[in-house]
Swiss-Prot record:
Native source organism of the sequence: Saccharomyces cerevisiae (strain ATCC 204508 / S288c) (Baker's yeast)
Active site positions: 119
Name of the molecule in the record: Nucleoside diphosphate kinase
Binding-site list for ATP: 13, 61, 89, 95, 106, 116
Protein role: Major role in the synthesis of nucleoside triphosphates other than ATP. The ATP gamma phosphate is transferred to the NDP beta phosphate via a ping-pong mechanism, using a phosphorylated active-site intermediate. Required for repair of UV radiation- and etoposide-induced DNA damage.
Enzyme class at the top of the EC tree: transferase
Phosphothreonine sites (modified residues): 95
EC number in record: 2.7.4.6
GO molecular function: ATP binding; metal ion binding; nucleoside diphosphate kinase activity
InterPro entries: NDK-like_dom, NDK-like_dom_sf, Nucleoside_diP_kinase, Nucleoside_diP_kinase_AS
GO CC annotations, alphabetized: cytosol; mitochondrial intermembrane space; mitochondrion
Length: 153
């Protein structure tokens, strides 16, 4: 990984998996030119979700959110590339799908805040923390993309 690249954590939530949106969501990141370095289907438990959403523990919506996130499989992914954290959030759209622009994942596939299809890290520090929660170091694959020379100067 070069000094200009970073990694982000993107999760397709149970609603996105159940609705068959996985391939369309992954393709948005691939078409942008980002490199997939880790992927797995996960049934999250309370401990993982409490660590992931630590800033929301104790808030009124937290139990319902955890219940939803445990309701089905989550596709956990790690993407690598230049400015991928910020650009990943742009690709996803606003947290509330009704405030998301058409052309974003949430703008195209979401309606309700509680079913917003995806999660994306909101900072480089959050990305590192979330990647370490969801993946073991050996699950992150370091590989050279042949298309990188066509994407980056």
């Amino acid at each position: 990984m070069s000094s200009q690249t970073e990694r982000t954590f993107i999760a397709v939530k149970p609603d996105g998996v159940q609705r068959g949106l996985v391939s369309q969501i992954l393709s948005r990141f691939e078409k942008k030119g980002y490199k997939l370095v880790a992927i797995k289907l996960v049934k999250a438990d309370d401990k993982l979700l409490e660590q992931h959403y630590a800033e929301h523990v104790g808030k009124p919506f937290f139990p319902k959110m955890v219940s939803f996130m445990k309701s089905g499989p989550i596709l956990a992914t790690v993407w690598e590339g230049k400015d991928v954290v910020r650009q990943g959030r742009t690709i996803l759209g606003a947290t509330n799908p009704l405030g998301s622009a058409p052309g974003t994942i949430r703008g195209d596939f979401g309606i309700d805040l509680g079913r917003n299809v995806c999660h994306g890290s909101d900072s480089v520090d959050s990305a590192e923390r979330e990647i370490n929660l969801w993946f073991k170091k050996e699950e992150l694959v370091d590989w050279e993309s042949n298309q990188a020379k066509w994407i980056y100067e």
